[in-house]
Amino acid sequence: GGSLGLLYASQATNMENTAKGTVTVGKSTLDAITFVGGCLGDAPAVKEDGKTKVNDLIENCTNRAAITHGGSCKINQAHYVGGCLSYVHEVGTKYYAAKTNNIYNYGAVKVEGGEFYDLKIGGVSGYLGGTTTNTYNYESGTIYFNATTRRHLHFAGVAQAIKDSSTDIANYADITIDGKIGHTLYGAGCITLNNNYTRTRNSNHGDITVNAEIATNNFIGGLVYDSGANLNYVDCHNTGNFTLGEKAKVGCQT
């Protein structure tokens, strides 16, 4: 659904799954990394004449359609759903690209049952670098999750490992997280694992309910975690309601 896999090029723009592109993942076992709905996979920098050629521009990964997962799917590698970007990096060393713009999800995502290794839903950027702008999960991008992950669940406006600067990481949708998370839950305008970035704006404007059993940490709602050096401007805010339900368990930090 409008996704691009492994990229060896200086630019990639306009990976889009349109509003008519509804996706259903039913009874299936997938052993490879999978991308559903306006996603971009690995985009490593390449070497020409012994010199590293950086990806100059990664822009416009967008999902506008509803995506549903049934109860019998088992996905044994990373699974990206709804306007997500994986890695942008120089192979084996640093993660960077000159510019990464506009990672968007507008589509409602429902994951009910099933088992996932590592799951990213709704406007999530992986390991990036350079100048990163606009990683959004919009109001129509509601998320309902009631399944199991063996590792992390990232959802609704998350960016990781920003090397230079970032702006506007945000969630506007209402979200419910149930089930079991095998490691960490990150979501809703969250930025994490940052290295040497200079500025960022992070926000959550949706109502979030968590009833899940989370093995380690729970990082949700307009926040920065594990920041690096040279941080000279940060704006973190939350206007949505957050509910940690009676059934929720968090193994470490919230």
Q: How would you name each of these model-derived features?
A:
Residues G1-T254:
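Surface-exposed loop/turn motifs in large extracellular/passenger domains
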